[in-house]
């Protein structure tokens, strides 16, 4: 697999379209950090890391509204790709959907949202947009 982040986002996108309540994704440290951010920001209900003989799995409980079963996540968009990396400084960082969405960045201080990176005044690689 050449792009594990794109695979992660695609699995989430497919689970949303199929209205799955739980999705299992192969684990990595970067995917674990992205999952923690999604849970903290309220895009997913819960997550659990399952260890096995290989790399482990992340079990994610998707978040849907009670009324019309609409998911909390509307768009998952990969920005920086293996063939074309996108980096930004904290000064040039734009807000996602005027602050309604989040950008997830990989920085020297770890994986964080665009707001956290702006507060710490550090830039990094823009992994994806979520809104």
UniProtKB/Swiss-Prot annotation:
Keywords: Ribonucleoprotein, Ribosomal protein, RNA-binding, rRNA-binding. One of its GO terms (molecular function) is rRNA binding. One of its GO terms (cellular component) is ribosome. SUPFAM superfamilies: Ribosomal protein S8 (SSF56047). InterPro entries: Ribosomal_uS8 (IPR000630), Ribosomal_uS8_CS (IPR047863), Ribosomal_uS8_sf (IPR035987). Pfam families: Ribosomal_S8. PROSITE patterns: RIBOSOMAL_S8. It comes from the Bacteria. GO terms for biological process: translation. Belongs to the universal ribosomal protein uS8 family. One of the primary rRNA binding proteins, it binds directly to 16S rRNA central domain where it helps coordinate assembly of the platform of the 30S subunit. Part of the 30S ribosomal subunit. Contacts proteins S5 and S12. NCBIfam families: PRK00136.1. This is Small ribosomal subunit protein uS8. It comes from Azobacteroides pseudotrichonymphae genomovar. CFP2. The gene is rpsH.
């Amino acid at each position: 697999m050449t792009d594990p982040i794109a695979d992660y986002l695609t699995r989430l996108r497919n689970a949303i379209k199929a209205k799955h309540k739980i999705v299992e994704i192969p684990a990595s440290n970067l995917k674990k950090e992205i999952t923690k951010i999604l849970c903290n920001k309220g895009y997913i209900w819960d997550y659990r890391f399952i260890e096995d003989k290989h790399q482990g799995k992340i079990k994610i409980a998707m978040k849907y509204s009670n009324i019309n079963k609409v998911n909390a996540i509307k768009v998952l968009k990969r920005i920086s790709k293996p063939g074309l990396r996108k980096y930004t400084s904290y000064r040039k960082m734009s807000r996602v959907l005027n602050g309604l969405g989040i950008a997830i960045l990989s920085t020297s201080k770890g994986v964080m949202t665009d707001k956290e990176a702006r507060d710490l005044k550090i830039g990094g690689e823009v992994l994806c947009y979520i809104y």
